Amino acid sequence: MNKWSRFKFTPNLPLGANGERVTGSKAHIELSKEAAKEGMVLLKNENNVLPLAAGSKVALFGKGTFDYVKGGGGSGDVTVAYIRNLYEGLKLQKEKISIFEELCDYYRNDIKKQYAAGAVPGMTIEPDVPAELLSKAQAYTDTAIISICRYSGEGWDRKSVIDPNNKALWEYEREMTEKSAELFKDGDFCLSVKEKEMIDTVKASFKNVIVILNVGGMVDTSWFAYDDQIQSALLALQGGIEGGLAAAELLVGDGNPSGKTVDTFAKSLDDYPSTYNFHESRNYVDYTEDIYVGYRYFETIPGAAEKVVYPFGYGLSYTTFDVETVSAGVVNSNCTSEANKLYAKVSVTNTGKFSGKEVVQVYIAKPQGKLGKPAKELVAFEKTRELQPGESQLMILTWEINDMASYDDLGKVKKSAYVLEAGSYDIYVGTSVRDVTKADYSYILNHDVITEQLSAKLVPTSLPKRMLADGSYEALPQSEPVDTDYSAIGNIDPSLTEGVAPCQRAIPYFRFADGMAKNGSHDIMDVVEGRITLDEFVSELSIDELIHLLGGQPNTGVANTFGIGNMPEYGIPSVMTADGPAGVRIAPEVGICTTAFPCSTLLACTWNPDVLEAVGRAGGEELKENNLALWLTPAICIHRSPLCGRNFEYYSEDPFVTGKLAGAMVRGIQSNNVGATLKHFALNNKETNRKNSDSRVSERAAREIYLKAFEMIVKNDNPWAIMSSYNMINGYRASESEDLLTGILRDEWGYEGMVTTDWWTCGEHYKETKAGNDLKMGNGYPDRVKKAYDKGAISRSEMETSVKRILGLILKLD
């Protein structure tokens, strides 16, 4: 096949053996199910109620039995051939268990009626179960399974109070916010009134009660964790196309739960330090908890530990494991030539009766010093293979010494530097942040060490204070605000960036046919075949041609998120992008069904990079088979608050887990010679007013928490593209931030790939290009860029730099 022939309007040629398509194939759907099983977390299992014994009879309660949520909404949605809910999954276990069908008929019919009336999956009302039906269920069995489901999506956050000023990008987003508030008077973190009534009835009526959480993120778990009338609970999250079957197989013992939490589950929403100001303003969010996010807060701040129901890294199994630290220390020449690392050698033995997997986690307790530190921070983890009863595995986990450094943004030790402060760096090994044992070895420093000297970037101007390790706050320097929306060519017309879905507005800026006069004498194939360099090719392009390449291009083929390139007179193909952190997203009207994989949070709960790489490889195959070039995933913002509507797209509250696992996803995707896109860069931790909300954060928290996963993946996994975020960061639009997109991303981290905006940002196109944002999506504003060029506000050199990065991505494709 000739170069780029997939992108030149050829049929979607199958990639599978014997001419079979891999998109939505049995193999990919099976992979989706197995990934979901590996990530689901057993939170509670008193009296070994699970797995269900052969011959068990069960009654299924809760609308979630049929109102199954495969994943979140917006760009994370996936068009699929079917969705297998919990009931359908359990029906396939008919040789092991039986189900009280009359109750299921009642729920099925009720949910069908609600869907017919316009209800969205996950947004239905919990129906009342008739007393007669309840009595029949009691007579049938003493075991009940309760399903609780939750749904959220792009463009709206989880909350219970209607914001009358919420100007959503699409009307659908406002509608969903209002519907959520109607269903959940106290917010959907908590149970609804109807859910509470149903649960109380079930507890009073059945001996054994099992809870399934089909949710996209953190919810209240205290209602079952401390209740002796509820014996078992499985955090099933949103499992994709076969999520119901994955949960069902675990319930009957066809597989052993090995997932671990990637977030801290607190007793109350108010226990999270981010809650009090999450909805304080539409215009800004103050990250006053600073680096104390998730377990870093709950394990450090006095009085916070008692607020935890299930800690970070927690998860039960049907078997038991013994985890022993054999030794720990500095990696030396006896093991490897690398002496800048520490290691922990750990033995894991399956001491129970079921085969299973365990996750070994290594945490560091740093000296508090002048900077203050979290009580523990994750530095390494590894999952065992499937261990049979009595079987052991010896593991050696290593990590960089310099990765234990902390960033000093105020000059308490050395300003704008990563510092290893003097003192003892203690090593803790175990199976959660709480279930750990201190190793015999500690890394001792007798003096401070500067590991990396940088310069100040993303300095806050309006963040009033930040939290310290003792729970108090320190005041931060303030500065005069600047007009960051100033434009040398006049303010941008708001109609370009606001209102209804902007596809129609984009049409005047798209090029649908040939007609541009060719300025240069060469073709892009001259670059491919080595006759000229890319620099030489780009130098021949006219200003208009350069500007054309700086913007998105119209959809072709099955795409619905627009493309890149599109200069046929130069042989430059129009290559397409695709949404979907949980699978390749193709619009339903196209008629192509892809594989819906588990949501990113569930994938993260596997703690298994091999699983993420396999999912990425499969998704990359589906992308390529459908003649798509750039997958707009993984999304790796941090779970700062349970309220973020897009948490299901993101991985964890911890940047190290996020970076390791999303990095594996990138490797898998790009093994197909198609591109992965890290997003949203950066600090897009809130959807409400996402195009204008200002994330006000300290430089230390930005670097140690919110940028760290991006840094890890850029340095280790070479993503082809990065998507800048809608929001502002300390008063500057992320898409226009030279500090972020050039100073940190390129100068410090050495990134050489392409940066794209999110779709229809409020940023000024020429300012985005100058800052290091190479591509404006879903379309550029060529007239404004040309006007800026004519006024001297942007140079040809700056445009050429971005065009070379865009063409560099296209040249990587086969």
Regions picked out by a protein language model, each given a short descriptive name:
Residues M1-D435, A456-D814:
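Glycoside hydrolase catalytic-domain context in secreted enzymes
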Residues D435-A456:
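Short beta-strand elements
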